[in-house]
């Protein structure tokens, strides 16, 4: 459960991401594909090369979903319901992949926002991404 301090940290950190959200989302996806090659199996129709328009496009979708989650941090299950349905019933993404992408997002944010990425912010973002992952996998049951 996110504490009030966690929510404040997440909103502040995501605010610093600003107009780079899509770029950071794509970079996190590239990190995931390179670090965890089995995740590529969900994207057989994508050009997964560096800078690919498809990876950039999906990175923007990831970032937009996270922006939505930040904006609805007190009601993520409702805000992310359609996305949860999509990943559980149509795409059938293995839930472990959300943890892998979350890790890659944390690395990407730490690389781009070193001054803001304090231990407290790191912990808050980790809890937030775990909460998002939990919501996205809630309909698998």
From Swiss-Prot:
One of its GO terms (molecular function) is oxygen binding. It comes from Macaca assamensis (Assam macaque). This is Hemoglobin subunit alpha-1/2/3. The keyword Cell inner membrane does not apply. One of its GO terms (biological process) is hydrogen peroxide catabolic process. The modification Phosphothreonine is found at residues 8, 108, 134, 137. The keyword Manganese does not apply. Residues 1-141 form the Globin domain. O2 binds at residue 58. Heterotetramer of two alpha chains and two beta chains. The modification N6-succinyllysine is found at residues 7, 11, 16, 40. The modification Phosphotyrosine is found at residue 24.
